[in-house]
UniProtKB/Swiss-Prot annotation:
One of its GO terms (biological process) is SOS response. InterPro entries: Helicase/UvrB_N (IPR006935), Helicase_ATP-bd (IPR014001), Helicase_C-like (IPR001650), P-loop_NTPase (IPR027417), UVR_dom (IPR001943), UVR_dom_sf (IPR036876), UvrB (IPR004807), UvrB_inter (IPR041471). The gene is uvrB. GO terms for cellular component: cytoplasm; excinuclease repair complex. Residues 430-592 form the Helicase C-terminal domain. This is UvrABC system protein B. Belongs to the UvrB family. ATP binds at residues 38-45.
Amino acid sequence: MSNFSIISDYKPAGDQPKAIDEIIKGLNNKKRSQMLLGITGSGKTFTMANIIERTNRPTLIMAHNKTLAAQIYSEMKSIFPKNAVEYFVSYYDYYQPEAYIPKTDVFIEKDSSINEQIDLMRHSATRSLLERRDVIVVSSVSCIYGLGSPDLYYQMTVNLEPGKSYPRDKLLNDLVNLQYERNDIGFERGCFRVKGDNVDVFPSHYSDKAWRLSFFGNELEYIHEFDPLTGEKLVKLDKAIIYGNSHFVMPKETVNKAISEIEEELQKRIAFLKSQDKLLETQRINQRTQYDLEMLTETGSCKGVENYSRFFTGRKAGEPPPTLFEYLPKDALLFVDESHVSVPQIRAMYNGDRARKEVLVEHGFRLPSALDNRPLKFEEWDNFRPQTVFVSATPSLFELNETGGEVVELIIRPTGLLDPECIIKPATNQVEDLVGEIQSTIAKGFCVLVTTLTKKMAEDLTNYLQELKYKTSYLHSNIHTLERIEILRDLRQGTIDILVGINLLREGLDIPECGLVAILDADKEGFLRSEVSLIQTIGRAARNSEGRVILYADKMTKSIDKAISETMRRRTIQQEHNEKYGIIPKTINRTIHALAELEKVDSKLDKKQTHNLFENPAKLKAHIDKLRKEMLKAASNLEFEQAAKLRDQLKTLEEAALELS
């Protein structure tokens, strides 16, 4: 059994050793929930990594969005290069769920675009969980959505060992049942091909490796891992386990049993709708379901097969669907990052999904069993989760109630940096005062972050500062991902001195060059000026040894009072620690990983082409598909050097797209 092994030049420092010991002590004492209160720059990810290494338990880390999940995944991948660090998020680049609008009698068909790279990584994650223990899966909250049953998924695997006999026709049939496609010309992920005594399989969890099964009659002589592009043999394998090309693969008997149960439910639903004199709905549900049943009978699958998942998994009506949590071992560990945001998201997901599907069921577009194709209810998630460590700088009531108010604090930073000094100034004439503060901050070589309450005010302030010849940019939700990354890069490199935003200057925005955070209209109580929002925004100045925060307010609100009191409490603890050990705070100039990814793409494509590609997901996906076809064509023409060059470019784009998604 492999153990977790951290590869890093750093050792736990500051509050990290104490926090690691306390969390591990709680885990050993069977505490179900613990709270790790980690402030900005305290090294929460490195602390989590050390807890994982010392407990040596399979781990799931949940983040509240794909971007944060990608950041954590990249960091964990670099900390644990010898272990299985996996990424599990929604594989849709674009997703429009099916819906019906009764008021206008409009039915919207399901429309989606699947990201092949993320689909591959999802398969890699479930495979790792089933085959090994040194696994870290970094996931978004979408992991609470239904997934194929782990029992069926594993039951459907094809296990191969050299020296054993496998009737070739049966093997090929098994591959088809696993939803692999025979393609003797275009060999890509999820395909197999037959050449003489060889069967080549491109597993669902690989992008650059395939397996060659060499037979003598029905006896499997060798299994070679090879490069599907060049045909070069890489290594000989002692065994191979082929997993399904979908998490919803099912044995024929299960499909037949499900068909029978779907027909039974259909007849009950038809009888009910007729009793309500809903003739249109009766005709609609009969026509749609009969078509799905025909497809299931002929192919073992159908469009929207997930809506019948209850029958395939053997669950009863109302029971929770199988999710990623059922793939976890019983002794797994769960970290919920930025839990003050993640937990409310988990709580909200079920109700939104339910409301849409109830309309579909009521109007004859789906059977009632479709309601069981859903995310977990919050109570179900709470019941399923293993021993959990919530991680946040601003824990909410749920986490504090779960831990009995006990908190393990990460307040002292390894760098010795203090929480920023907070100054309150009158909101009257706040813009004029801000201009003076901006001037003095820029003179020191630092940049400025300004947060406003409304989009209109942010736009007006940006225009005003630009008229005064300040290099200013505006960060808002309509900006494409690449442009956002470019703005942050320009800010850090000094091309921009001031960044104005509304609610985008909070979690995950780490800019060591920031010398001032200005919060306009700080006394306007509400979501954007709550205690949590203020503490998170104040934290943006905590990566600079000279960082300051100015709150413009005409009155002291409860949120301001609590936020400043908490910041000063932390600052006092940090100052005392620094004085005791003679530590001098020093700004750490840390590169933003996503910027490095962007530069990798820039090095292979010109800036104009890069910007055009990342303007929208459709352009990027089309270009990646085009590159893949060119690569395969070059390989088939035996132009291996050109094919390898295209493969490198393709891999770079896919990795960057993942970071920037």
